[in-house]
């Protein structure tokens, strides 16, 4: 009895906490805690209710979904309650859901249940009612019983039909409103301060001025029809498409649980390629009649469960903001964090981007911050928990001199980045420039790791790029005996000197890239090399560009920013001296290019699936030689998708974006010279 009384007190405490956070999340669109922390509160509450079933009868709060509607909007009653879903956090939870479902439907264990597997969009749930084919009312989910009337705002959403043909006289559809990540970034760049895309979508829908909502580029996906005549969820989604609604393309139907788990893993591993936030996979019993038999609990349907992804966000303490100097002199602030597990990866550092980002989010050393990790993207700080901030924490002061060399810093026009003026006097810049110079896509000198470069620099054996090619001579004439130092032996030294000598014959493209000129990446270096063909022609044209104010370049795909960077680089005497010293040690080969006549010259292409004629890396080289730019991600700017065997999700995405799809054979033809 005493245990139950203690449990009741803990349950009341949890209910108050959850209710508080529901208001912040569903009404104010300003959550204080992460989704993972909220899920943990709900998990603790469910543990108590499962251990003490009698408390369920007095726990009225569990019947509520979300929070009461905002009083700024008219209240709307849902004729059919809008439920939330139960969550699963591992495969065992999903398997238990399958077992419960089979038991409820009197299905044998050896029989399977077809499931509709759909993405769980991290947005705002909404309902739209049509009367006689015309949009009548739209509302939020609210607490499940009552929502907010958002009809005027919802009508501003692009691609939402205002009139539907061949529909029942009374039709209610439900879905999720969201905002793309790229539109979210632009929204914050325009002066807003939303913590994440979900908050941005919810806040935009709840604007009192629908003209503001119209500017926010909201999108939606529909996922259900209330009281549908369809026989399956698969048929239901198809019917929504027929009526003109946006329906998510990443959906499969399967009666194989392993295939359902594989779908989860595929989406989880590739979610960074999807331009909107998803936080799990929803498994629904595909048969609508079975859904009706299963029914609902007070809070959620028994015929569906949301298998949540591991938290992509987590809260931890920011211990220090350090400044990293790159090879171009950019001062990049880095957050040094208390170690935190995010999606199975231990994160200790996160990007803070620039000075403006720190000031906009008011990030301070000692703060507790929300860290987000998506795919292979560098972890980023998306928000600060200011409720946990103590009074002694002061605003971060961005350095006015370079932390590495003490040189003054400056902010370039129309840029957020701050630069060190030290250049060749800045240790960090020099080391980063040398590291870039010896990298795989530049001189490709194997044996020059970060530790080795730092050692040679501290021994004053390599203080600039040219020193690499006199290293062997310097060592033989110095008192430093590498053989006596840890990590160096006769063989490792011989291998290093051999790699340096082998690198002395280099293509013009790799040479240009190796110089580390601002805005000159691998692709631009290839365009310049193809255009000028020889080192002598390129160098002389660069001198003209730097010395003659009226002289400019007219090269396809080379913009004014890049030309300005070339002009600045070749205007500096120390850069010219460095190049002239370098070429004394090198043989720079001319570019043999026939790419101008290729049908994919100047095009952006993406590969998907397995190629039968060559490896992916060989295909990349072939395409780039033909003048194309090979990208790993698909967007509306992509010109061609090259589809091999067993193409992935990019194939469907290309169709939706109207990107032209080429077979492997056709791509091979396109890479040929059109003169042949």
Curated annotation (Swiss-Prot):
Domain BRCT: 595-676
Organism: Ehrlichia chaffeensis (strain ATCC CRL-10679 / Arkansas)
Keyword Nuclease included in the entry's annotation: no
Cofactors named for this entry: Mg(2+); Mn(2+)
Function: DNA ligase that catalyzes the formation of phosphodiester linkages between 5'-phosphoryl and 3'-hydroxyl groups in double-stranded DNA using NAD as a coenzyme and as the energy source for the reaction. It is essential for DNA replication and repair of damaged DNA.
InterPro entries (UniProt xref): BRCT_dom (IPR001357), BRCT_dom_sf (IPR036420), DisA/LigA_HHH (IPR041663), DNA_ligase (IPR001679), DNAligase_adenylation (IPR013839), DNAligase_N (IPR013840), NA-bd_OB-fold (IPR012340), NAD_DNA_ligase_OB (IPR004150)
Keyword 4Fe-4S included in the entry's annotation: no
The encoding gene: ligA
SMART domains xrefs: BRCT, LIGANc
Active site location: 120
Family named by the database record: Belongs to the NAD-dependent DNA ligase family. LigA subfamily.
Protein name as catalogued: DNA ligase
Superkingdom as given in the UniProt entry: Bacteria
Alphabetically ordered keywords of this record: DNA damage, DNA repair, DNA replication, Ligase, Magnesium, Manganese, Metal-binding, NAD, Zinc
Catalyzed chemical reaction(s): NAD(+) + (deoxyribonucleotide)n-3'-hydroxyl + 5'-phospho-(deoxyribonucleotide)m = (deoxyribonucleotide)n+m + AMP + beta-nicotinamide D-nucleotide
Any one of the GO CC terms: cytosol
Binding-site residues, NAD(+): 35-39, 84-85, 118, 141, 176, 284, 308
Binding site for Zn(2+): 402, 405, 420, 426
PANTHER family in the cross-refs: CHROMOSOME TRANSMISSION FIDELITY FACTOR 18, DNA LIGASE
Enzyme Commission (EC) number: 6.5.1.2
GO biological process: DNA repair; DNA replication
Pfam family, one: DNA_ligase_aden
GO molecular function: DNA ligase (NAD+) activity; metal ion binding
